[in-house]
């Protein structure tokens, strides 16, 4: 039986007020993702898929190779961290998705990116 790689994904998001224009329905958010390899062998992140949903229910799908122009190799016990951004038409939304990855044998697998909230500070209680 092949052991599934153990990967932990954590995301922290912030509202970028200086780049947002609420009166034009432009709300900018930055998010920092940490991908930790908790397994015993190397893994490589090859691609990503995002489902972005605003508070009106409008969904946008984004997919592509790597993240921020990289396809990082993550050694056991190490992590890869990056920051990216999203622009919504509403002050509240969510993002979720998965990473396409391969293990040290070249076997493909997916790692879930748990849903996280994008919200301006006034909406967070």
UniProtKB/Swiss-Prot annotation:
Signal peptide range: none
Top-level taxon in the UniProt lineage: Bacteria
HAMAP family in UniProt: ApaG
Xref: InterPro entries: ApaG_domain, ApaG_sf, Uncharacterised_ApaG
Domain ApaG: 1-125
A single GO BP: error-free translesion synthesis
Protein name: Protein ApaG
Pfam families associated with the record: DUF525
């Amino acid at each position: 039986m092949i052991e599934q790689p153990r990967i932990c994904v954590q995301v922290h998001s912030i509202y970028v007020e200086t780049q947002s224009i609420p009166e034009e329905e432009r709300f900018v958010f930055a998010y920092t993702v940490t991908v930790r390899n908790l397994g015993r062998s190397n893994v490589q992140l090859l691609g990503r898929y995002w489902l972005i949903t605003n508070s009106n229910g409008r969904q946008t799908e984004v997919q592509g190779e790597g993240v921020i122009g990289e396809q990082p190799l993550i050694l056991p016990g190490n992590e890869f961290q990056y920051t990216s951004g999203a622009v919504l038409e509403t002050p509240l939304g969510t993002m979720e998705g998965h990473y396409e990855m391969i293990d040290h044998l070249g076997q493909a697998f997916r790692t879930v990116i748990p849903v996280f909230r994008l919200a301006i500070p006034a909406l967070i209680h």
